[in-house]
């Protein structure tokens, strides 16, 4: 398995996204709603509803950053990007070790990624 760690967003973009996500009533729901059978056992977080206006707006920003990044394009050769999800964990929440499904509701997922908006204090998933 290959890992690519790379600064995708600049400080201004991160700040913008964080402020958007901090607004009240953004439509956060139980992350298990989109988890596969195995992942739902270890998934304990919140996820922004994909149909919300803010999710669509921020997904477009992330997608554009990925598609316009030369290093990511050379590493992945993306043909289509779909299924961008925004998740957060409060105290006591985590997303344990899991394998992403090859097929998700939005299509085949040959490659998955995590974009951290905060410093990586992530210890329970596949990022070490």
Locate each region found by the language model.
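Catalytic core of non-heme Fe(II) oxygenases with the double-stranded beta-helix
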Residues: 70-128
């Amino acid at each position: 398995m290959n890992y690519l760690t790379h600064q995708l967003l600049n400080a201004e973009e991160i700040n913008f996204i964080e402020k958007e996500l901090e607004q009240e009533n953004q439509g956060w729901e139980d992350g298990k709603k989109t988890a596969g059978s195995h992942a739902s056992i270890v998934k304990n977080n919140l996820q922004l509803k994909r149909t919300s206006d803010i999710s669509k707006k921020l997904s477009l920003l992330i997608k554009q950053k990925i598609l316009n990044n030369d290093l990511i394009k050379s590493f992945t050769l993306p043909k289509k990007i779909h299924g961008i999800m925004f998740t957060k964990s409060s105290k006591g929440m985590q997303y344990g070790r899991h394998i992403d499904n090859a097929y998700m509701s939005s299509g085949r997922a040959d490659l998955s990624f995590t974009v951290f908006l905060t410093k990586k204090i992530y210890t329970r998933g596949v990022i070490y």
